[in-house]
């Protein structure tokens, strides 16, 4: 397969995965929050990781081009950006911030977590007002927003305040000026969205609750918005609090707004009830308790299910500081929404029927009644599921499904949830169904399930496009979980007496078949590959505690079979196109992976009271491998894959080496140049183990060795350090914790240069130095030398603690723009560099799209006085911080 096709397939699979986490715009229980103007606010990534917000609105672009220097817009994101601005080519200083490194880093993390990030225009103006003066200005403003904050394109040469990261759409929170030009901007943005058909973009508005809204009513009536975040506070005549207390005392209600939206430029737009997150976030008398919020949500969600979209909260920091029972206010509101939603995002369609089953000594016969459910979507509404046909099927003995065969005895019960376009689901049930769940969320998906007696719990989740899942269950499997996320995937499963099973497939197009038998405590199968034609077959039998099979390849076929007393086995395939087969009996095993230029090797070792097993697999493109089996004896399996070769994998030492107890088989595969010696064993397992040597010629030598071990100790170091950096108010101290891992197998010596006498010590590994100007660090602008981490130098470990930022208290004054100077003292501080990722989806038109995806976890803008980023005189504080910064830097560099 060509590189272009592989990359295209990878993008498609990635888009499916991210889509599974993304916002469901048709849900009734979405939660939106505004962020960017909170006093002492946490980073954007904090709220993405720690909250259940579905939509986060970043505010604000608070200066419009017609009022901004050089015809540029301006921005304010509180304490999240340095006091540094873009300059035009002719040297004019704009009001557009260019030091938003934290937002650059956090946007990709939020996207990966499935959060929808919108950039808000407007808010409370700092000094006077903002407005769009002409149609040309409106069009140019929309083009600028798309180029600067939309997807990165080669033809855009303007500023990128968030780097390569992009937002998911734009929000209009207009509270000043006039109502002209905004419908023009919305229509222009809709046209620009078509340039990126693989992603889904949204447009929202945040009007005041008084009707008609002075600034946004014209735009809402004449252009297509996806979400309307109505501020039901700060206005007594339409306050949500007053409605809860006395509905007759309110002039403008949710009912009035629903009628208005249904006659607007997009009658399908979703209405969000906007509430303050605390008594201090807006007018104190407009704050609602969770009980009061439940009353208004339950009333209007039930009354207008097609228009009600959820709740908006102003704002994130106020919510974080207002904790009820240990939970932030906004998280409580999310729980309120989910409790009131009669059809929450994880809803299921459940039915159980009796099935006749007969069992004989030589064969089993199962009669199954199958219901076929078809799901269809239209551009104007979410998917619907309706029964379309019923059929009667009878199977005797074994049931053949997909590309593998499974056998089952007596079926049980199943719960199926389907949310997708063009989805076909088939479910079979019979007597005594304790609990089973099947969740499918793909496009063009077919699911077939049969269950048998007494399966306490089983779960199957498929999330993919063009996916076919077939599952059969047999006697007494306490718990089973199958998760498939792929395009064109086929899965079949059956088991007997298997306490727990987990299968996860993530690929496109892929086929997976799994068979289980008695006493299987746990099983995990994971396949991840772009544009693949992968077939995975796993068979297990008695007393096999755990088995893991992972395939990651293009056009790969993997077959793994396990039998009695197999403690743990891991097989990883990463190649294109490949066929692999491995078998082992009475074995425990350990995976070891070695990699070379164009070859990958996986070694699986095992030891048991009655057997030793070792599997070595080297992988390269276009390879075929065959594996033979033997029973009841110490065995060693060696599977090699090269370009291209035919390989026979044998099990040694043994008196019999064949699938049917035939004579021993030897192998002479083609091995890439170079020699490798592999010694099984670990420091904690000093037992006899065979030694395998791979010479540079096509000869394979397997010989037993006595008490040879290999030390595979991995050293993990957690480093906590503090450094001084520059924030909008001057110097600040940042404490970070990161983890480094040293692995003897992969570590390589890095040559170091001897220090030059008298020269300053070089920065530590992963750091570099830059020079910049700090206007607030001293009475006059000061040139400072910053020691900063290089890009992606410290990737966060799973247990990484969040950076703690100490900010010097400052008065609530507007941002002071100070021109850089070349004079001043030199101080060494550090900053954090951004990191980026790319998200790919397959939807575009936010108005009429048939998006059907699972949501994941916002906005009553009030006037802000320059935001949270303010400045004070640093006559006294700066000197102390300079001294402290120099001391910390000296300790850090060992001076």
Swiss-Prot record:
<dbReference type="InterPro" id="IPR001223">
    <property type="entry name" value="Glyco_hydro18_cat"/>
</dbReference>
<keyword id="KW-0472">Membrane</keyword>
<feature type="active site" description="Proton donor">
    <location>
        <position position="175"/>
    </location>
</feature>
<keyword id="KW-0326">Glycosidase</keyword>
<keyword id="KW-0147">Chitin-binding</keyword>
<dbReference type="GO" id="GO:0000272">
    <property type="term" value="P:polysaccharide catabolic process"/>
</dbReference>
<keyword id="KW-0378">Hydrolase</keyword>
<feature type="compositionally biased region" description="Polar residues">
    <location>
        <begin position="506"/>
        <end position="543"/>
    </location>
</feature>
<dbReference type="GO" id="GO:0006032">
    <property type="term" value="P:chitin catabolic process"/>
</dbReference>
<keyword id="KW-0119">Carbohydrate metabolism</keyword>
<dbReference type="GO" id="GO:0005886">
    <property type="term" value="C:plasma membrane"/>
</dbReference>
<dbReference type="Pfam" id="PF00704">
    <property type="entry name" value="Glyco_hydro_18"/>
</dbReference>
<keyword id="KW-0325">Glycoprotein</keyword>
<comment type="function">
    <text>May be associated with endosporulation.</text>
</comment>
<dbReference type="InterPro" id="IPR050542">
    <property type="entry name" value="Glycosyl_Hydrlase18_Chitinase"/>
</dbReference>
<feature type="compositionally biased region" description="Low complexity">
    <location>
        <begin position="544"/>
        <end position="555"/>
    </location>
</feature>
<feature type="glycosylation site" description="N-linked (GlcNAc...) asparagine">
    <location>
        <position position="90"/>
    </location>
</feature>
<dbReference type="GO" id="GO:0005576">
    <property type="term" value="C:extracellular region"/>
</dbReference>
<feature type="compositionally biased region" description="Low complexity">
    <location>
        <begin position="346"/>
        <end position="425"/>
    </location>
</feature>
<feature type="compositionally biased region" description="Low complexity">
    <location>
        <begin position="658"/>
        <end position="692"/>
    </location>
</feature>
<feature type="domain" description="GH18">
    <location>
        <begin position="29"/>
        <end position="340"/>
    </location>
</feature>
<feature type="compositionally biased region" description="Polar residues">
    <location>
        <begin position="556"/>
        <end position="577"/>
    </location>
</feature>
<feature type="compositionally biased region" description="Low complexity">
    <location>
        <begin position="479"/>
        <end position="505"/>
    </location>
</feature>
<protein>
    <recommendedName>
        <fullName>Endochitinase 2</fullName>
        <ecNumber>3.2.1.14</ecNumber>
    </recommendedName>
</protein>
<keyword id="KW-0624">Polysaccharide degradation</keyword>
<dbReference type="GO" id="GO:0008061">
    <property type="term" value="F:chitin binding"/>
</dbReference>
<dbReference type="InterPro" id="IPR045321">
    <property type="entry name" value="Cts1-like"/>
</dbReference>
<dbReference type="InterPro" id="IPR017853">
    <property type="entry name" value="Glycoside_hydrolase_SF"/>
</dbReference>
<feature type="lipid moiety-binding region" description="GPI-anchor amidated glycine">
    <location>
        <position position="866"/>
    </location>
</feature>
<keyword id="KW-0449">Lipoprotein</keyword>
<feature type="signal peptide">
    <location>
        <begin position="1"/>
        <end position="22"/>
    </location>
</feature>
<feature type="compositionally biased region" description="Low complexity">
    <location>
        <begin position="578"/>
        <end position="589"/>
    </location>
</feature>
<feature type="propeptide" description="Removed in mature form">
    <location>
        <begin position="867"/>
        <end position="895"/>
    </location>
</feature>
<keyword id="KW-1003">Cell membrane</keyword>
<feature type="compositionally biased region" description="Polar residues">
    <location>
        <begin position="426"/>
        <end position="478"/>
    </location>
</feature>
<keyword id="KW-0732">Signal</keyword>
<feature type="compositionally biased region" description="Low complexity">
    <location>
        <begin position="699"/>
        <end position="712"/>
    </location>
</feature>
<keyword id="KW-0146">Chitin degradation</keyword>
<dbReference type="InterPro" id="IPR001579">
    <property type="entry name" value="Glyco_hydro_18_chit_AS"/>
</dbReference>
<feature type="region of interest" description="Disordered">
    <location>
        <begin position="343"/>
        <end position="712"/>
    </location>
</feature>
<feature type="compositionally biased region" description="Polar residues">
    <location>
        <begin position="590"/>
        <end position="657"/>
    </location>
</feature>
<comment type="similarity">
    <text>Belongs to the glycosyl hydrolase 18 family. Chitinase class III subfamily.</text>
</comment>
């Amino acid at each position: 397969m060509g590189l272009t096709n592989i990359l295209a397939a990878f993008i498609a699979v990635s888009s499916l995965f991210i889509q599974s986490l993304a916002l469901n715009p048709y849900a009734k229980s979405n939660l939106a929050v505004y962020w960017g103007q909170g006093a002492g606010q946490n980073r954007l990534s904090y709220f993405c990781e720690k909250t259940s917000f579905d939509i986060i609105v970043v505010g604000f672009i608070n200066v419009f081009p017609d009022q901004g220097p050089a015809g540029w817009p301006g921005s304010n994101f509180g304490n999240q950006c340095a006091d540094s601005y873009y300059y035009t080519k002719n040297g004019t200083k704009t009001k557009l911030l260019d030091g938003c490194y934290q937002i650059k880093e956090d946007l990709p993390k939020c996207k990966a977590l499935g959060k929808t990030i919108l950039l808000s225009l407007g808010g409370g103006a700092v000094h006077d007002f903002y407005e769009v003066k002409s149609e040309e200005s409106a069009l140019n403003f929309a083009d600028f927003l798309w180029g600067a904050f939309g997807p990165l394109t080669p033809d855009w040469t303007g500023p990128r305040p968030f780097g390569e990261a992009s937002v998911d759409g734009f929000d209009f929170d207009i509270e000043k000026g006039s109502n002209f030009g905004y419908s023009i901007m919305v229509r222009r943005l809709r046209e620009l969205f078509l340039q990126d058909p693989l992603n889904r973009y949204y447009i929202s508005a945040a009007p005041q609750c008084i009707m008609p809204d002075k600034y946004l009513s014209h735009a809402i009536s004449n252009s297509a918005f996806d979400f309307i975040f109505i501020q039901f506070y700060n206005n007594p005549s339409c306050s949500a609090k007053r409605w809860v207390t006395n509905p007759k005392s309110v002039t403008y209600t949710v009912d009035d707004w629903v009628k208005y939206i249904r006659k607007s430029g997009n009658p399908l737009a979703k209405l969000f009830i906007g509430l303050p997150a605390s008594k201090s976030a807006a007018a104190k008398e407009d704050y609602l308790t969770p009980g009061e919020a439940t009353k208004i949500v339950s009333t209007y969600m039930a009354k207008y299910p097609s228009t009600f979209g959820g709740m908006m909260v102003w704002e994130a920091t106020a919510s974080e500081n207002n904790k009820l029972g240990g939970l932030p206010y906004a998280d409580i509101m999310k729980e309120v929404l989910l409790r009131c939603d009669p059809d929450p995002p994880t809803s299921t369609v459940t039915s159980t029927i009796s099935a006749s089953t007969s069992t004989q000594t030589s064969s089993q016969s199962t009669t199954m009644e199958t219901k076929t459910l078809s799901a269809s979507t239209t551009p104007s509404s979410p998917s619907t599921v309706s029964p379309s046909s019923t059929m009667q099927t009878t199977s005797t003995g074994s049931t053949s499904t997909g590309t593998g065969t499974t056998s089952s005895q007596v079926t049980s019960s199943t719960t199926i949830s389907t949310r997708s376009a063009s989805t076909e689901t088939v479910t079979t049930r019979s007597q005594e169904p304790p609990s089973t769940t099947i969740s499918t969320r793909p496009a063009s998906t077919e699911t077939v399930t049969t269950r048998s007696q007494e399966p306490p719990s089983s779960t199957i989740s498929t999330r993919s496009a063009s996916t076919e899942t077939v599952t059969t269950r047999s006697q007494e499997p306490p718990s089973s979980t199958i998760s498939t996320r792929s395009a064109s995937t086929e899965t079949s499963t059956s088991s007997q007496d298997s306490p727990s099973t987990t299968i996860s497939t993530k690929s496109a197009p892929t086929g997976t078949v799994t068979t289980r038998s008695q006493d299987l405590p746990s099983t995990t199968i994971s396949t991840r590959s772009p544009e693949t034609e992968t077939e995975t077959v796993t068979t297990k039998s008695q007393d096999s505690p755990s088995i893991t099979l992972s395939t990651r390849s293009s056009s790969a076929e993997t077959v793994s079979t396990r039998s009695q007393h197999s403690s743990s086995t891991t097989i990883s395939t990463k190649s294109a196109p490949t066929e692999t087969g491995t078998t082992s009996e009475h074995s425990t095993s350990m995976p070891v992976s070695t990699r070379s230029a164009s070859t990958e090797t996986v070694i699986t070792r095992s030891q048991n009271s009655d057997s030793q097993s070792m599997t070595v697999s080297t992988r390269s493109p276009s390879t075929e491998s065959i594996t033979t089996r033997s029973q009841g004896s110490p065995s060693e399996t060696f599977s090699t894959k090269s370009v291209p070769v035919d390989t026979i994998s044998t099990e040694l030492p043994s008196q019999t080496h064949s699938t049917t107890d035939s004579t021993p088989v030897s192998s002479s595969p083609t091995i890439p140049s170079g020699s490798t010696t592999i010694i099984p064993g670990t420091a904690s397992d000093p037992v006899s183990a065979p030694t395998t040597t791979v010479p540079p010629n096509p000869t394979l030598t397997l010989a037993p060795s006595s008490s040879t071990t290999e030390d595979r100790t991995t050293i993990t170091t957690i480093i906590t350090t503090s450094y001084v950096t520059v924030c909008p108010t001057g110097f600040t101290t940042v404490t970070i914790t990161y983890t480094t891992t040293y692995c003897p197998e992969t570590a390589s010596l890095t040559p170091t240069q001897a220090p030059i006498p008298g020269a300053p010590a070089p920065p530590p590994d992963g750091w570099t130095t830059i020079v910049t100007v700090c206007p607030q660090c001293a009475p006059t602008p000061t040139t400072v030398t910053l020691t900063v981490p290089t890009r992606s130098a410290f990737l966060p470990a799973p247990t990484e603690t969040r950076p703690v930022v100490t900010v010097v208290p400052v008065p609530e004054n507007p941002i002071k723009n100070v021109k850089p100077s070349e004079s001043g003292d030199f101080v060494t501080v550090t900053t954090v560099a951004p990191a980026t990722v790319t998200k790919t989806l397959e939807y575009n038109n936010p108005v009429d799209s048939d998006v059907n995806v699972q949501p994941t976890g916002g906005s009553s803008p009030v006037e802000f006085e320059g935001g949270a980023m303010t400045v004070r005189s640093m006559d006294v504080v700066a000197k102390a911080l300079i001294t402290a910064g120099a001391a910390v830097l000296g300790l850090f560099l060992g001076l």
